């Protein structure tokens, strides 16, 4: 008789045990595993998926052999655990045997009394994984959005799990999901309403796209920025309940044209980074060609200290114009190690030691994101209402002293 693909009792093994066993062990029989009563799939670890299943097994008084096989299924045999439930010390596993050259094992189980026993079998399985995605729909005024979080389950493990409970490692578990063989299924695991969002404009001299024929300019990028904290709807529809996993985000904007049916315009898509509680997620929308930033160096002086040791006094000027009707919040990113290398020479094997100096336009607008990264926050006014007037220029000076360089 051929072994069935997965988790079936082997009547052949039962016959072999009966023939090889001495007369005194004639009561020893092989228990056939019945169908699963409950299956739970836990997907919190991206490298290993835990499966727990419960069955009711009928045991004879004395020693029983229970066969467990997993042909063509990606189970890690070193992780398989058999646990009797709600029987205290009346049932115990006394031995585990692994038949050679087979994807199988045999539990030797001792029962003080005959009867039906609920058991839980758990194991790690491969090729059963999950990915995450999002759908962000912004309101017409772009002040709030609705964020939906989806999980897609991919089952290429070699086993049909049927109706199962599924847990992503956060949020609520889902019951009664059909997890079939060679199947993928997407489920909505979170819907967050009225999430506050800011439309920000970002300038980065080193990563920004160059502007043709403008050597001192880089294109500004547009981003939606949302914070993973409870700042919107209350209760189950609030952000900040768990860290948001990495995944693709599709971004839409509600169409608010008067006299027309409500619709949504597709703005683009971006990869949302892993976002912890109280951290920010930035979603790229595209280039902002109506916000101009020009970066120039106003001061670059070296101050000798001793030998080859020196300080470098630097002033960088940012000249900004906003051609949009509405005001804009501009973030200017600078990496202080890279800024130091720009003026002190590259190839440094140490972190920059730096201080803001007095000629900085407004030190309160310079936020330290880390030891060596800063963001300058500048609010730009909208363009004048008069068509013949140009937007005002906004200037910001960043005055930095790099200390003890060589």
Residue ranges and their predicted role:
Residues 2-6, 11, 15-406:
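Long, intrinsically disordered, low-complexity accessory segments associated with secretion
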């Amino acid at each position: 008789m051929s072994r069935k693909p997965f988790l079936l009792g082997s009547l052949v093994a039962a016959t072999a045990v009966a023939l090889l066993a001495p007369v005194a062990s004639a009561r020893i029989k092989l228990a056939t595993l019945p169908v699963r009563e409950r299956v739970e799939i836990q997907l919190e670890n991206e490298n290993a998926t835990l499966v727990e299943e419960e069955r009711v097994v009928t045991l004879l008084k004395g020693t029983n052999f229970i066969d467990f096989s997993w042909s063509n299924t990606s189970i890690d045999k070193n992780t398989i655990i058999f646990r009797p439930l709600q029987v205290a010390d009346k049932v115990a596993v006394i031995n585990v045997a692994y038949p050679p050259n087979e994807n199988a094992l045999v539990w030797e189980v001792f029962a003080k009394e005959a009867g039906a026993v609920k058991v839980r079998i758990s194991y790690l399985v491969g090729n059963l994984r999950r990915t995450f995605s999002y759908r962000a729909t912004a309101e017409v005024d772009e002040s709030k959005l609705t964020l939906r979080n989806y999980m897609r389950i991919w089952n290429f493990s070699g086993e049909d799990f049927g109706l199962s409970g599924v847990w992503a490692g956060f949020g609520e578990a889902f019951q009664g999901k059909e997890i079939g063989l060679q199947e993928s299924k997407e489920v909505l695991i979170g819907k967050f309403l009225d999430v506050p969002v800011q439309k920000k404009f970002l300038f980065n001299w080193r990563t920004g796209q160059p502007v043709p024929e403008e050597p001192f300019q880089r294109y500004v990028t547009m981003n939606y920025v949302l914070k993973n904290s409870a700042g919107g709807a209350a209760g189950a529809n609030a952000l900040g309940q768990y860290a948001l996993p990495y995944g693709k985000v599709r971004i839409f904007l509600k169409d608010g044209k008067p006299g027309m049916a409500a619709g949504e315009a597709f703005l683009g898509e971006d990869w949302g980074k892993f976002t912890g509680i109280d951290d920010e997620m930035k979603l790229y929308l595209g280039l902002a060609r109506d916000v101009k930033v020009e970066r120039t160096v106003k001061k670059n002086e070296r101050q000798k200290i001793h030998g080859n040791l020196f300080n470098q006094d630097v002033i960088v000027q940012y000249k900004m114009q906003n051609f949009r009707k509405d005001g804009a919040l501009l973030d200017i990113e600078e990496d202080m190690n890279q800024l130091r290398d720009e003026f002190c020479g590259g190839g440094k094997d140490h972190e920059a030691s730096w201080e803001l100096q007095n000629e900085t336009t407004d030190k309160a607008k310079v936020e330290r994101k880390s030891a060596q990264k800063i963001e300058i926050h500048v609010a730009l006014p909208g363009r004048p209402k008069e068509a013949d007037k140009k937007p005002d220029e906004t200037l910001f000076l960043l005055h930095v002293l790099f200390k003890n360089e060589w």
